[in-house]
């Protein structure tokens, strides 16, 4: 009985090691496929739309940034 329990424990631990390795392997394959497939299918437009959205966000916050820059310049000129 003791022998079967130890054997079962070793097999179970080996299974955990193998599944962790398999999980890392499959996640690597999925990450690689998610990067390669859009470029093969023609998903290059996503990068353009992403940069467009980024510019829209920058334009949205840009007036506030200009006001802060002017305020900072005014404060710095007072220090000099």
Curated annotation (Swiss-Prot):
Family that this chain belongs to: Belongs to the non-disulfide-bridged peptide (NDBP) superfamily. Medium-length antimicrobial peptide (group 3) family.
GO biological process, alphabetically ordered: defense response to fungus; killing of cells of another organism
SS bond partners: none
Subcellular localization, as worded in the UniProt entry: Secreted; Target cell membrane
CC per GO annotation: extracellular region; membrane; other organism cell membrane
Function statement: Antimicrobial peptide. Has antifungal activity against all strains tested (MIC=12.5-200 uM). May act by disrupting the integrity of the bacterial cell membrane.
Record's signal peptide: 1-24
Major localisation: secreted
The name this protein goes by in its record: Probable antimicrobial peptide clone Con10
Cleaved propeptide residues: 56-80
UniProt keyword Chloroplast present: no
Keywords assigned: Antimicrobial, Cleavage on pair of basic residues, Fungicide, Membrane, Secreted, Signal, Target cell membrane, Target membrane
Tissue specificity field: Expressed by the venom gland.
């Amino acid at each position: 009985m003791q022998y079967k329990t130890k054997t079962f424990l070793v097999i179970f631990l080996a299974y955990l090691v193998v599944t962790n390795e398999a999980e890392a392997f499959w996640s690597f394959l999925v990450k690689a496929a998610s990067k390669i497939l859009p470029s093969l299918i023609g998903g290059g437009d996503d990068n353009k739309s992403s940069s467009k959205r980024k510019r829209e966000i920058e334009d949205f916050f840009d007036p506030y940034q200009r006001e802060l820059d002017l305020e900072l310049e005014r404060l710095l000129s007072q220090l000099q």
